[in-house]
């Protein structure tokens, strides 16, 4: 897929850098499960009430709120000898790994101690996540000079991102069962350590081996502007519409992938390790659709293909509402359908659209805003995480009996309710994506 100007080696090294998405998936899939397990999980007990868990997530986001655009702005103006993006990846990798592991070793001296632990670690985790993810994604418009190049590099990143996400969705269930040997907490802790090391290793390989400084030496120099002036440029109509659509979509997507464990255990009534099969179908279908999505985007437009993807995703998610233990075989083709819809909507197009917007704005204003654009997108992605956590934590316990100390557990009614919320968010994102004009 490499085009003139970028070698195959560069594509490979850049793709490896998205390994931090292993941690993203662990966070999304296992954190709520660890602190708020389903009723039929025998070896895990709730560590926080739903309300306290939500407050911990919100508190962490407040700490993190300013870092996304700030890191983006700093990387746009960095003069580091390691490259203006790679420097921040090197800076954030180790803190990202450490905070991920600490999530699963909370203080338990009291409920308040656990709450403060989760809130603090959450803020530190996403600050480190910003240092890695924002500058990494901003490399796309730095390295790729044309719209087609950006589509290709985004597709390569999406392939690797899907591989790493799938690894983190498919394998942990097996590792947890095998290592834990009946003790889910032991299995989760060991599995998190293993996969966290793998995820951060790719970040450092990319930062050290990409040779960003050499690859971007001919990049056009733009005038330096103040942080507040950079932010002002982001409020163009088309950019605002895109960010709203992006936020709504990823709120729904995070909910969908975040309840896979609950769906498998509570609705399909299978063991937690069975999420391996479901996850493989979901992300395998997306992977198979990548080359077709790339070709369709070149033949038609990003917008048309993206809208088609979201419609497929809505149909598949609606179908999941009608699955029960008795007809659970229907869940398999429905997750495949969802996976086909995720190919462009969750993986390829968010990267290409924001890259094109950043390049277009930069050329019109003679400014460098790639980093801050991806930083603000990262901020909306984290707001989507927060929305997912609030919606999921609130709805999953619908119909649950209150246990001691106000604890509740996830229920079937809660899983179905959470899916409905995802469908609503997907539908709203479809409306806003339909409003956005196509970049030339």
Q: What does each of the following model-derived ranges do?
A:
Residues 2-440:
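Membrane-embedded alpha-helical bundles of multi-pass transporters/translocases
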